[in-house]
Amino acid sequence: MATRRYCTLVAAVLNTKTARKLISFGVKMVQKSPAVWRRIPPIYIDETAHPVTSNQDYDVPRLAKRVFDEAPRVERWFIESPCMRRIVEVQVMLPPRPEEPAPMLYLLDGVTAPRRSGWLREGQLEKGLNNEQVIVVMPTEASGSLYENWVADDPEVGRHQWDTFLTQELPNIMEDPTTGLKFNGRRIIGGLSMGASGAIRLAAKHPEFYHGAIGLSGCYSTTSAMGRGMTLAILRCVGSDPDNAWGTGPTPTWARNDVADHPEGLRNIPVYLFAADAHITKYDIELHTGRTRLDLPGATILEYASYTSTRDLERAMINAGMTHQVVHYQYGGVHAWEYYGDQLKAGWDAVYKSQVS
């Protein structure tokens, strides 16, 4: 376990300009060589749930079951999914006033994306949106999926067809009046980390479908050295083969999914982006004291990559003539759940409440 002294030492080392240059250099070198990135250990494999593809051929998506879950106003929905060929479990937080119409927020998880959404597990959804009139939809069991359609099933993580599920199958269920949900017609998508990358990418690819997007500490490039390196790390850390996601090497599919290279889809929808600069603060030292010794260095590297990527996306949007995006850079802070409740609220205010007030 990490002591306060250890965390203070990590901060002294990683808060230097030299360390930032070494992080960038290291990530760039890793992504260049398959012999290196294929050796990235599956550090999250014990924390994730990889549901087995049942190979069940469902004709249409259907709500098979709906039960109360562990938190107030939270239900678990079991969706028969034709594209995933299995039952996909989705956690749904109902609005505080269910008799009144509400928008839907599709809220995506980080890399582990287990059966219980991290937004609920870490208490940050309650912190950020508990009193907001919104239906929050949280897909689960999406470990390392990038929330994308993969070109092939993976022997470790199974079948991922999340683009189709999130933009076609799941909305058909959620917006069906027979569920009793009073939907006001507005859809927002958001997430943190891997979920931020997925949310912004899906919004850019389906701008006619979403009415706003929130990206918290995401990585939005798939072809830059930093972006490709972090994407490979996400895929390998859950034990999957990156070739099954978008193909082997720099394929056209990898290129198409680079939002920093193709930001045009974000032109006409509200966008909120957040990243901290990965400068380790006293608060971060307190947070990580008692955690594993790898947590603080890992959180620093992840947030530095997110910070770099967010700046790249903002620059691309500005160069394309976009000025509507709200981008918040925080001085101090690493990749840690404790920051995201407040930022979820800020993002919600920016992309939804400011548009309807």
PLM region spans:
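Non-catalytic cap/lid and distal C-terminal segments of serine-dependent acyl enzymes
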Residues: 4-7, 11-13, 19-31, 36-357
